[in-house]
């Protein structure tokens, strides 16, 4: 699967697991010109992007469109998972945890830092579990919390953070 588009590989693998699955793929880079068209018809957005510019863009549009957002970030042995329901005005935002000016793709770069496969797997599985809980309406999501995963030392912890107002682009 090297040098193949991730979206094509993912769609193929999902169809192998369940051929009845309806999959809509987008083969363009997500940007401010196409994001609204892409996410407007979905209730829950699961973000697996690998850079903070895209994560902040998704966060801003989910906030504007009042979507539910589950986002994950990974680097080496570390992972972060957030769940936001922007229909609820008390929900914090990704920018309440990560300060946009303090985060650069140079500091958190999967291509440079590398990613351990199990880190991606655990963060992705946790995001899928959060989505299932939202769909079914059971359990507690990570509202105004971050799940911090440290696989090197096998630590999992939740940290609360507060909502602060910020201006979207």
Region roles according to the model:
Residues 1-169:
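Adenine nucleotide-associated cytosolic modules
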